[in-house]
Amino acid sequence: MTLRDLINKLLGRQQASAARARERLQLVLAHDRTDLSPDLLDQMREEILSVVAKYVEIDVEEGAVSLETEDRMTALVANLPIKRTLSGDIKLKEQSTESSASK
């Protein structure tokens, strides 16, 4: 997702059908080049979300994991809106683990 796409999404602007078709074609080509099945991509998405959720609270409904192709290079892009960090919770877990280990 480019900066322009993000701004358009925030402002509620609709994409032109040609732009939408181009984006879909790029997605199909990216899937084809990487040889990733949709099931594998969904599994990767779930695992990425669960790992990130250990450290920050994310907005799963607004988040997206996708393949993007630019200049003949395909990238896995995770766009995950962060609601808040869980650093306080992590510190508590670390202290709990340390005190259990010292017993």
Curated annotation (Swiss-Prot):
It holds the Pfam family MinE. The keyword Cell division applies. InterPro entries: MinE, MinE_sf. One of its GO terms (biological process) is regulation of division septum assembly. Keywords: Cell cycle, Cell division. Belongs to the MinE family. The keyword Cell membrane does not apply. It comes from the Bacteria. This is Cell division topological specificity factor. It comes from Prochlorococcus marinus (strain MIT 9211). NCBIfam families: minE, PRK00296.1. Prevents the cell division inhibition by proteins MinC and MinD at internal division sites while permitting inhibition at polar sites. This ensures cell division at the proper site by restricting the formation of a division septum at the midpoint of the long axis of the cell.
